[in-house]
Amino acid sequence: MKTATSYAAFLLSALAALPHASAHGFVSKVVVNGQSYAGNTPGGDTSPSPIRQISTISPVKGAANKDMFCGYDAQVASQVAAADPGSKVTFTWSGGGGQNWPHNTGPLMTYMGACEGTTCDKYTATDAKWFKIDEVGREANGGDWVQQEIMNGGTYTVTLPSNIAPGDYLIRHEIIALHLGMTEGGAEFYPSCTQVRITGNGSGTPNQTVSFPGAYSDTDPGIWDKNVYDPSAPYTFPGPPLSNLVSGDSGTVDGQGGSTSSATLSGGAAPTGTASGSTPAGTSQPSSTTGTGNAGANPSSGKCSLKSRAAPTTSGNLSANYPRHFSRVMKRLLNDFQTTVHQW
């Protein structure tokens, strides 16, 4: 017979989808090298932008989906944003109807791919070769996922490699929402592509590239994650390791309350991202982390002063790390369920 813990975990996974069954989102704005560019509403009218417009705010489902590279029906954009090696690129995520991003569970990852043989405003990207420049998961000490900062209204900033060769590139920034990630096929992928033109005298080229689809599997431990609601469990990022172009002090996280975090990954590479809310915060130094997983997958942790939730226990009343968008009604349902389980 299944344990009470497994029943509660299943209920958590099922209930996590209920309050936002139709609430998804997209990248609504990017700031590249200080210049702001608005994105187009999915399926809406089209204005000049370097962000490739998608047809729906719904997530891409299935790691083998043909739209994994830039999102559903992603269209070539008319603009190419000017950037330099080491430029900062800030992404604003929005939910449907102008609401905040609705999810708070799962990693953020960023890739780049050269627009081979042409400019990005003419490049279809189906055959693009991608290299990873950033990945971030949970905060330090069993805290929240960094995605919580995006749900709180924050933005996310990555730093482009400082030695990257000049040319046109796509920046593929994605959120993988794992509120249903306890079941195979439950992960929701939200990829977004922004077109940039990098100048300068850099000569760096990536030593490893991947394709989308192809870089992930629905059974990868960081995509099908039975411990997604256990903050004490290590997380294994899907996809390739960070590119050889990424190095140095580059991992910070700023939250709504001005908290900061950073992470250092295996091989000395560090994520380049910064999640920023309404209150600016400084940059903290990378910290060593450990974890387990596939070769090439990098565990990460951060240092954010967000309020942490207690780890699940199986003694006494069941406790669980509820997604923050759980309503009182759903929590009451779970409590009633727990009472019933203990009566068995």
From Swiss-Prot:
It catalyses: [(1->4)-beta-D-glucosyl]n+m + reduced acceptor + O2 = 4-dehydro-beta-D-glucosyl-[(1->4)-beta-D-glucosyl]n-1 + [(1->4)-beta-D-glucosyl]m + acceptor + H2O. Transmembrane segments: none annotated. Glycans are attached at residues 201, 207, 317. The keyword Disulfide bond applies. Binds 1 copper ion per subunit. Residues 259-292 have a biased composition (Low complexity). Residues 311-320 have a biased composition (Polar residues). InterPro entries: AA9, AA9_LPMO. It is found in: Secreted. GO terms for biological process: cellulose catabolic process. O2 binds at residue 179. Its main location: secreted. Gene3D superfamilies: 2.70.50.70. Its cofactor is Cu(2+). Cu(2+) binds at residues 24, 190. Keywords: Carbohydrate metabolism, Cellulose degradation, Copper, Disulfide bond, Glycoprotein, Metal-binding, Monooxygenase, Oxidoreductase, Polysaccharide degradation, Secreted, Signal. It comes from the Eukaryota. Lytic polysaccharide monooxygenase (LPMO) that depolymerizes crystalline and amorphous polysaccharides via the oxidation of scissile alpha- or beta-(1-4)-glycosidic bonds, yielding C1 or C4 oxidation products. Catalysis by LPMOs requires the reduction of the active-site copper from Cu(II) to Cu(I) by a reducing agent and H(2)O(2) or O(2) as a cosubstrate. This is AA9 family lytic polysaccharide monooxygenase D. It comes from Gloeophyllum trabeum (strain ATCC 11539 / FP-39264 / Madison 617). The gene is LPMO9D.
